[in-house]
Amino acid sequence: MTRLTFRTTAAAVTATLAVTMLAACSSGGGGGAAHLTWYINPDNGAQATLAKECSAASNGQYNISTNVLPSDASQQRQQLVTRLAAKDDSIDLMSLDPVFVAEFAEAGFLAPIPDSDAAAFTKDIVAPAVQASTWKGKLVTAPFWANTQLLWYRKSVAQQAGLDMTKPVTWAQIIGAAQTAHKTVGVQAKLYEGYTVWINALVEGAGGQIVDNPGAVAKNLKLGLDSAAGTDAAQVIRSVVHDGVGGPSLSSNDEAGSLTLFEKQDTSAFLVNWPYVWAAMGPGGDKVSFRDSDVGFTTYPQTVAGQPSKPPFGGIEIGIGRYGKNKAAAIEATKCITSAEHQKEYMVSSGNPAANDTVYTDPAVEKAFPNGLAAVILQSLRQAAPRPQSQYYGDLSTALQEKFSPPGSVGSGSPAKAQKFILEVLKGDRLL
């Protein structure tokens, strides 16, 4: 994630309100159909396909066109914030990264979801996706697709180490196995959002949380980093570094870099990464020769032995723009887009996991995510933990990354230093 300051939405866009707004997408449909514009994150065209299918199924009620946002999540946010702060009525629907939901809701950029429609958006949805779509007790976005990280491993290395991968394993166990085998554990520790993802999962997995009172204003915000859970998280990071299993590029590794490391058969052992890994290594991807014979997958490692892990949670939620002129049609379109059938279709065509847990036993999904992978993804989603929900998330995440970087500097005092720094930044006493 680009290092931006997100202290308040108003502050982030003050300098941009004078910029001339881009022209709205051209209307596509007639006959009285409401024209809806859906701002989507880049994919392989699967969201655009859903837009066409739902338009056709609406019987002339609405017609959806799509506008593709930048590939970088922070740039997606910036474009949407700039437009919404200017009360752009061309934004009817938007694909939102879960970490921005609180900020958009707090700023009043999201149209309320009527209580009478909330059940349609939450039925059969995994709990973390509902949590990520909720702000101050109200559903403010509709869960669309959900993501989670798995533990990928070399079967031969795990077997040699005597690890039973049908049971939960700990970070300490996989670090020890990799160290003994002189191989690596792939993580994301670059100074970017992926590092926050790792830190948060470690803290949550130790029974803690980074933000203790979501929704609080900056002066009243309470953090849980300076805690036993924070210390446990720091110890895992320290072990990856000082036990020599992080690899030479640890402090610059993102998802792609850590996957590249894992694909080196002679040096790799374990990797935490998203489900796209399986397809990326297979036909049409990197065509890793040992994928089918020696790559296994299971749920995220435990931070503390015996305490269930809290895998990272990601995905996309659908927000309805406050200033759009066709909110009733937007609600109906969102119901169509996020239906179980369309979530299944999207999961198969894009490779992005569904938020609806009923689709995971569908034959088409099991074919696309074979050998029990679909079931492991669902299990991981059910126990996943979203990143901290806060209207100040951007500043919080950037400050956290700074105080935990480089990974080699992390020690028992890092959580307390990070907590102090984050609070100072949010209260305006320090600058990023």
What would you call each of these model-derived segments?
Residues T82, S90-D92, F121-S156, K183, ...:
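A structural signal for short loop-to-beta-strand junctions that line the ligand-binding cleft
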Residues Q159, H242-V245, G284-S350:
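Extracytoplasmic/periplasmic substrate-recognition and gating elements
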Residues Q159, Q379-L432:
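Conserved C-terminal helix/tail region of periplasmic/extracytoplasmic solute-binding proteins
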Residues P98-T148, L202-G205, G296-T298, K367-A368:
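Hinge/lid segment of periplasmic solute-binding proteins
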Residues V140-F144, Q149, A172-D226:
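Extracytoplasmic/periplasmic solute-binding protein
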Residues T2-A102, A119, D286, V304, ...:
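Conserved N-terminal structural module of periplasmic/extracytoplasmic solute-binding proteins
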Residues A178-Q179, A218-S251, Y300:
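Glycine-centered hinge/linker elements that transmit conformational signals in sensory
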Residues T298-T299, M347-D395, A399:
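Long, aromatic- and glycine/proline-rich binding clefts that accommodate carbohydrate-like moieties
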